[in-house]
Amino acid sequence: MAEQVYQLTREGYEKLKREREELKKRLMGEVAERIKEARELGDLSENSEYEEAKNEQGMIDSRIKEIDYILDNAEIIENGGNHDNSTVSLGKKVKIKDYRLNREQEFVLVTPQEANIEENKISIESPIGRSLLGRKKGEVINIKTARGSSKKIEIKEIS
């Protein structure tokens, strides 16, 4: 069975590596200490602190394994995948004009693993991301949003 390939920007790849290291430190540090302290309390069968710490340990360990799998199967997309700024693609910064809101917005198209609206990173699998892929500067597009409404946007810049 072929492994799934995860396309990531360099920044997204490095961010996952940092998250993995932080989780490992937490797992080896505070969570391990909480488990040790809970064990010292005696009977583990009715020890809620022990159960909570073990559950947290399991969740952290699962996330570390998930990150390892993604990193092991990652394909790094450098500089938006190509140097051609005439077409919207993964990793590109896109400035659009939203005619409904009458304002310009700027964001980067990223993989679902990297999407973060607070950092203006939009997934290529989101309605707006899918609608923009392969489009060119100056194109005007009507997009169906996740809520089912429609919005008209124009691509102002691609970088």
Swiss-Prot record:
The keyword DNA repair does not apply. SUPFAM superfamilies: FKBP-like (SSF54534), GreA transcript cleavage protein, N-terminal domain (SSF46557). Belongs to the GreA/GreB family. Residues 2-41 form a coiled coil. This is Transcription elongation factor GreA. Necessary for efficient RNA polymerase transcription elongation past template-encoded arresting sites. The arresting sites in DNA have the property of trapping a certain fraction of elongating RNA polymerases that pass through, resulting in locked ternary complexes. Cleavage of the nascent transcript by cleavage factors such as GreA or GreB allows the resumption of elongation from the new 3'terminus. GreA releases sequences of 2 to 3 nucleotides. HAMAP family: GreA_GreB. PANTHER family: TRANSCRIPTION ELONGATION FACTOR GREA. Pfam families: GreA_GreB, GreA_GreB_N. InterPro entries: GreA/GreB_C_sf, TF_GreA/GreB_CS, Tscrpt_elong_fac_GreA, Tscrpt_elong_fac_GreA/B, Tscrpt_elong_fac_GreA/B_C, Tscrpt_elong_fac_GreA/B_fam, Tscrpt_elong_fac_GreA/B_N, Tscrpt_elong_fac_GreA/B_N_sf. Gene3D superfamilies: Transcription elongation factor, GreA/GreB, C-terminal domain, Transcription elongation factor, GreA/GreB, N-terminal domain. The keyword Coiled coil applies. Keywords: Coiled coil, DNA-binding, Transcription, Transcription regulation. It comes from the Bacteria. One of its GO terms (molecular function) is DNA binding. One of its GO terms (biological process) is regulation of DNA-templated transcription elongation.
